[in-house]
Amino acid sequence: MNKTPMTTRGAEKLREELNHLKTVARPRVIEAIAEARAHGDLKENAEYQAAREQQGFIEGRIKEIEAKLANAQIIDVTRLNPGGKVVFGATAEIEDLASGEVVTYQIVGEDEAEIKEGRISVTSPIARALIGKQEGDVATVQAPGGTREYEIVSVRYV
């Protein structure tokens, strides 16, 4: 099975969520189930049914996170030395040659992507066009809205 690239930051966020689910959410829902059981007939007990449903969601999410972490290739961006090239984990400042707009993106794993925070998926059209390029290069992006060209202004590994 292929490993999925993930930054150390992304892995840490998943570990924090996993810890919260195991130490806070799971015990809380187990307590809610026990409390609802005490109310009697389980067939018509909405509290019990809701708590069991929540438990199923929590257990499913725990398994999902554990699988993601087990299948992750965690990459420490600060230790990269790709010689100025855009690679997974790099932060690239790019200029749209048509509009002159300058934006900064970090290329991250699919689960870490958050466009509003400047993190784009390694599988996105922009990231695919940028990877392997370096400062001064022009990347051509085939996007749903048409072809766009971006000049790479700077590349950082933070």
UniProtKB/Swiss-Prot annotation:
- List UniProt keywords, sorted A-Z: Coiled coil, DNA-binding, Transcription, Transcription regulation
Question: Is Cell membrane one of the keywords UniProt gives this record?
Answer: no
Q: Please give the coiled-coil regions recorded for this protein.
A: 49-73
Give the source's domain of life in one word.
Bacteria
The record's Pfam families line, in alphabetical order, gives: GreA_GreB, GreA_GreB_N
Q: Which Gene3D superfamilies match?
A: Transcription elongation factor, GreA/GreB, C-terminal domain, Transcription elongation factor, GreA/GreB, N-terminal domain
**GO BP terms, alphabetized:** DNA-templated transcription elongation; regulation of DNA-templated transcription elongation
Q: Name one GO molecular function term.
A: DNA binding
The Swiss-Prot or TrEMBL record describes its family as follows:
Belongs to the GreA/GreB family.
- Report the function annotation for this chain: Necessary for efficient RNA polymerase transcription elongation past template-encoded arresting sites. The arresting sites in DNA have the property of trapping a certain fraction of elongating RNA polymerases that pass through, resulting in locked ternary complexes. Cleavage of the nascent transcript by cleavage factors such as GreA or GreB allows the resumption of elongation from the new 3'terminus. GreA releases sequences of 2 to 3 nucleotides.
Protein's name according to its UniProt entry = Transcription elongation factor GreA
Naturally occurring in which organism (per UniProt): Methylococcus capsulatus (strain ATCC 33009 / NCIMB 11132 / Bath)
